[in-house]
Regions:
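Glycine/charged-rich beta-loop-alpha catalytic/anionic-binding loops adjacent to active sites
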Residues: 101-104, 243, 267-277, 323-328
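Short acidic loop-to-helix transition motifs that present clustered carboxylates
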Residues: 34-35, 55-57, 93-96, 139-143, ...
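Fold-independent oxyanion-binding glycine-rich loops
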Residues: 8, 30-31, 52-53, 68-70, ...
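Beta-strand->loop->alpha-helix junctions that form or flank phosphate-binding loops
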Residues: 50-53, 91-96, 134-138, 233-257, ...
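ATP-dependent carboxylate-amine ligase
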Residues: 1-38, 43-49, 61, 65, ...
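Phosphate-binding loop of NTP-binding sites
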Residues: 19-22, 43, 57-58, 69, ...
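Acidic-glycine-rich active-site phosphate/pyrophosphate-binding loop
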Residues: 253-273
């Protein structure tokens, strides 16, 4: 089968393209914005990419068009598909019908930590010899690819609550039918499609409704919103993490060396295993608890899973070191929600000690562009010594609010820019040896990471 994917460079659709290719299909695709690591991954798979959504792409005559949720009515190619009554489906529906239907699906849902937790879970199963298939919204460094199809009975998937397509407004995860589902956390996000937290809770309850009675829900026991979801109705076994009577970290963290930590995991009163790894922060320990509990559901002993986490390498764009120049380290992170920004900076502060942190932020997610959470930005940036914000001056990524005003509570610590080159000059001029620069965006950010490294190197 030849499938042509509209919106192929999104993290989900790009992974789906890889799965389709590995299943033996001919895959082509198009998108408006192409940037690493997804573009690199697709090209390595031999998938042809086409820039833009020109209507003449129907001349490729694929057997099926697979539509990403970035596509809306008015898109030239989509309009041509509709006018000609050509066959099309959504990405999640195609995945559910062609890949997941005969698998034991382990799904990871939640506002934050989905990508990291999915990667942890896939790695635990891999290290245990389960050879799982997976689809992750990033590139796990243990695998070097965001998606893989195997002949294993098990498939691990990052389960996103964003809507499926313009013609199917249900959350993507209702198509996955997991037997094991992690509900990692839940707070308001995606303000472009959800009016409030209650609307998101409804979608999460739809997910709960799809888990079979013999399945299991792994739930963050600290989250009131998730408890509200369960009170609407639950027909599956529930295990909680982050609370004393469930999976929890029972002993204080032990600092082994710079950038490393160890902690004991308990399941209720019983010690379940010790994790020694290079990750930092309470959020990653919570992610680990969820992954260990889910892996236990398919038969991996917790002590074995804990040992596997000692070999876990985090996902690209999750505090990924992009380079060092002039004594300054530059990190790349996907954080774009105030909670994620705060968590990222808190983790870096713990690692960096008294070293200066320079936060470089592009608030370009749909929620951030609407300004719904702009008032939370200053507090989320509290651990940064200097803040450099960027707002595109025009186009689809431009902000509907004033970034300078939003950052004003930070005083002289914060500056806002509308051009990337000016931003690079300012950051480079401010940086000192020993500083830690963390770039936070859910997009390519104009290749700013390499521009910063080049500017710092030229200054040295």
């Amino acid at each position: 089968m030849h499938i042509h994917i509209l919106g192929i460079c999104g993290t989900f659709m790009g992974g789906l393209a890889v799965l389709a290719r590995q299943a033996g299909h001919t895959v082509t695709g198009c998108d408006a914005n192409v940037y690493p690591p997804m573009s690199t991954q697709l090209e390595a798979q031999g998938i042809r990419l086409i820039e833009g959504f020109d209507a003449n792409q129907v001349s490729l005559e694929p057997d099926l068009f697979v539509i990403g949720n970035v596509v809306s009515r008015g898109n030239p190619l989509m309009e041509e598909i509709l006018n000609r009554n050509l066959p099309y489906t959504s990405g999640p529906q195609w995945l559910g019908e062609h890949v997941l239907s005969k698998k034991w699906v382990l799904a990871v849902a939640g506002t934050h930590g989905k990508t990291t937790t999915t990667s942890m879970l896939a790695w635990i199963l891999e290290d245990a010899g389960y050879n799982p298939g997976f689809l992750v919204g990033g590139v796990p460094m243990n695998f070097g690819i965001s998606a893989r199809l195997t002949d294993s009975d098990f498939f691990v998937i990052e389960a996103d609550e964003y809507d499926t397509a313009f013609f199917d407004k249900r959350s993507k995860f209702v198509h996955y039918h997991p037997r094991t589902a992690i509900l990692n956390n839940l707070e308001f996000d995606h303000a472009d499609i959800f009016p409030d937290l209650t609307a998101i809770e409804t979608q999460f309850h739809h997910l709960v409704r799809t888990v079979p009675g013999q399945g299991r829900l792994i739930v963050n026991g600290r989250e009131p919103a998730l408890e509200r979801v369960l009170t609407r109705g639950c027909w599956s076994e529930v295990e909680r993490f982050g609370v004393a009577d469930g999976w929890h970290v029972a002993e204080a963290n032990e600092t082994l060396a710079a950038g490393q930590e160890a902690f004991w995991v308990h399941q209720g009163p019983k010690a379940a295993g010790e994790v020694k790894w290079a990750l930092q922060g309470e959020h990653n320990r919570m992610n680990a608890l969820a992954a260990l509990a889910a892996a236990r559901h398919v038969g991996v002993p917790p002590e074995q899973g804990a040992a596997s986490l000692g070999k876990f390498q985090n996902v690209k764009r999750r505090m990924e070191v992009r380079g060092e120049a002039a004594g300054v380290t530059v990190y790349d992170d996907f954080a774009h929600h105030p909670t994620a920004i705060q968590t990222t900076l808190a983790g870096l502060r713990r690692r960096a000690g008294k070293a200066r942190i320079l936060a470089v932020l592009e608030p370009r997610s749909n929620t951030m562009k609407l300004g719904v959470m702009k008032a939370q930005l200053p507090a989320s940036l509290a651990d940064a010594d200097l803040v450099f914000g960027y707002g595109a001056p025009s186009g689809k990524d431009s902000l509907g609010w004033n970034l300078t005003e939003a950052l004003a509570p930070l005083g002289v610590r914060a500056q806002a820019f509308s051009d990337i080159d000016g931003l690079v000059r300012a950051v480079s001029a401010a940086a000192q040896p020993g500083d830690q620069i963390v770039v936070m965006s859910n997009g390519g950010f104009g290749g700013i990471h390499q521009k910063l490294l080049d500017a710092l190197a030229a200054r040295a």
